[in-house]
Amino acid sequence: SNKIGFSNNKDSVNYYIPFKEDFSSSQIVSGETAAHLSWPMLGEHNAMNAMSAILACQECGVKVEDSIKALEAFLGVARRQQLILENDKVTLIDDFAHHPTAIKTTLKGLRDKYKSSRIIALIEMRSNTMKSGLHDDLLNPATEEADIVYWKSDNNSQLKLLQANAPAKTKVIHSINETVEEVVSFSKPNDLIVTMSNGSFDGLSASLFKALSN
């Protein structure tokens, strides 16, 4: 197997350069081939995924232009920055992000697209690693792009630490129904609400959809 690298600058033979800050539009360069990728996926992590796929396919004989056509037809998968609701009140997105790096890159991509929106993030710490406290020092920095953050965890000491580190923006989810009511009560036009979990989150996104659709 061949080892192929790429970068986000012209120092490499293979690289990508964003045309938009949210990385939904980028220039893709592989050797002497340059092409334009425009697709619905946000964030640099998705641009890196696209670049990896393009280069891998190129090794199998697929032209860069053909790979880009396929990527531009890709509409995403469930729970990867999935647009659940968009109306004159709010935008609701559901995402599978469940560890600090994924949370950070997802929120950064959303912030780059929804620059003027207030971002309300609701995050469930569901995995054993997240609940163990191993990543606690990374969680507040991971959510710096969000204006308000709701956390759900079985670890009460972990929740207290998160609140202590960012008291102005941190809230705790004790009840899904109560949280839905609270979010609906203070949400305002142009808000972006994003739920993040690798589980069902006790039906939170569906409950928010129902409440915010009315």
Language-model-derived ranges and their functions:
Residues 1-36, 73, 78-80:
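Extended acidic/charged loop-beta regions that coordinate divalent cations
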